[in-house]
């Protein structure tokens, strides 16, 4: 089971997630707390809108209520477009100014947030834009993954180099 603290830029970090029983998972699934492909997952408690990503594969993993699931109506807005809009600094500021409550633990009030309006291009224009945005997002994700692999490699090799150990 994931919470906001497990969210990263492109998905969940499962290193510290809480494991729950099959029975509890089924209850959460019945409560619609298991993301589906193309759902937009949004950190809504604490650092609201800090982490936002598209669920790219169905998994048997539940999320806590600190994460909102936005399930776009694809007849109106495509998931890539909604993701792009929600990541805009102007949207984040507007949401912070108008749809967040609480000072110690700020959180998005979802019933109010549903009133948020975007000006959207036609679905044809969205499809063209979504293709470009998806390709850019995937390239960035690949770059982030490669950077993490290189960091791990550096952290493994550097101590050996410094100590004079043969590699």
Question: What residue spans do the PLM features occupy?
Answer:
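A short glycine-rich beta-alpha junction/loop motif
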Residues: 60-68, 100-127
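Short beta-strand-centered aromatic/proline hotspots
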Residues: 52-57
């Amino acid at each position: 089971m994931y919470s906001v603290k497990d969210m990263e830029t492109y998905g969940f970090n499962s290193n510290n997630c809480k494991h729950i029983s099959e029975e509890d998972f089924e209850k959460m699934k019945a409560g619609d707390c298991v993301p589906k492909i193309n759902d937009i997952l949004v950190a809504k408690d604490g650092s609201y809108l800090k982490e936002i990503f598209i669920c790219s594969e169905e998994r048997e993993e539940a999320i806590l209520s600190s994460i909102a699931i936005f399930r776009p109506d694809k007849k109106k807005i495509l998931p890539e477009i909604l993701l792009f809009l929600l990541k805009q600094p102007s949207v984040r500021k507007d949401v912070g100014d108008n749809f967040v409550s609480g000072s110690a633990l700020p959180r998005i009030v979802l019933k109010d947030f549903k009133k948020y309006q975007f000006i959207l291009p036609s679905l044809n224009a969205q499809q063209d834009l979504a293709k470009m945005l998806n390709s850019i997002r995937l390239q960035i994700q690949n770059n982030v993954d490669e950077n993490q692999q290189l960091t791990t490699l550096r952290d493994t090799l550097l101590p050996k180099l410094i100590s004079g150990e043969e590699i």
